Amino acid sequence: MSEQPHRPPTTAPPTAPSAADRRAHMYGKAFAPEYQGELTTLSVNSSLTDVLTAGTAQLRAAERAGAPGEAARSGLAVAEAHRRLGQVAEADRAWKASYRAAREAGDTSAMAWALWSGGTLARQRGALPLARRLLRLAADSGERAGDVVVRGYSLAGLAETGRIQGDYEAVTALHEQLLAEARRRGEARHTVWALEGIAQIHRNTGSYDSAYAMFEEAAEIAAAAEDRRGHAWALRGLADIVSVRDGDTERALGLLAEAEASCRAMNLLGALAYNHKMRGNVLYRAGRYAESRELYTRALEEFDGMDEPRGRALARLGLVKSLARLGREPAETAADLDVLAETLDRIGLRHGRESVRRAREELGLTPTPPPAPAGNRTEESR
């Protein structure tokens, strides 16, 4: 009998890991450094209502025990939960109380974290000069305390404040520095934040392909690290690019629906409001103006409820444009755009007036010239 020919094994060789898999395995699970002391068992995905309940209970226990250090750290979690729930007055009281307790305990690191929380709240409220001042103090305090995490978070807050204002040249290098530091330490949550920030700068300056790639990487890292908040923001960024670059409305809406599920599970009211505003943007670009009007109206109500002036102004701009497309009187639209231009200037958003100018151009309106001050009129106004 002849010898059977040798056959290679039928099992396929192991597949090489994809670039996404390799990136994801560079990082550990996301953690929430703002949950400190006895609250370190809380996770980055803990519901904010659960954080508030646990934080308040621990704060009261620390106060009864006369432990200002623990009161400062549990108070930080309380402040952050209130802030993310849009409860501005409560958040303001909580971060200040946390700072006072940290100062009493002589804990410079806890003082830095309280300042970071206060600066982040100030940015959320549209008080950008105050945000910069508090975040700079937080970064300096963190450096003195040798706490690289709070220093990094505070510098990240400064970078985000500058980015929101449209000062891209000044903060791009800082974003990239923070991204490199986060990658080196394997910090998933901070890496995701930095990637999303740089991606947003690229998107706002028209570099859609690179923005998409960075939002995509951020989404992959966040998913692997179980960072639902970071993942939701990355999906929102991807939806924006898919809509504006590709015109793929249904895919964009699907990404936003996935992000909304995470926002609702964690009770992320601010992120949910921005999700609804983005859904309005997607529908507006698709010419579905009645639907975009409804989403902008919902987002506007949500921003009103949490005293978020930047989100409120941007949602209002979308609503004004939608109403104009649905037949509103041009004079009323023009008057609203004049008010919005002043509002965006007052908040300190450098790109705000340009957004209003583009809206006027898109809608075929001309700006209303401001009245010349008495005794100081130009030659043309005479």
What name fits each language-model region?
Residues M1-G118, Q124-A127, L337-R382:
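Flexible inter-repeat linkers and adjacent short helices
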Residues T56-R60, K96-D107, R136-D147, E176-G186, ...:
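Amphipathic alpha-helical segments of tetratricopeptide repeats
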Residues V51, A91, A131, V171, ...:
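Single-residue signature of alpha-solenoid repeat helices
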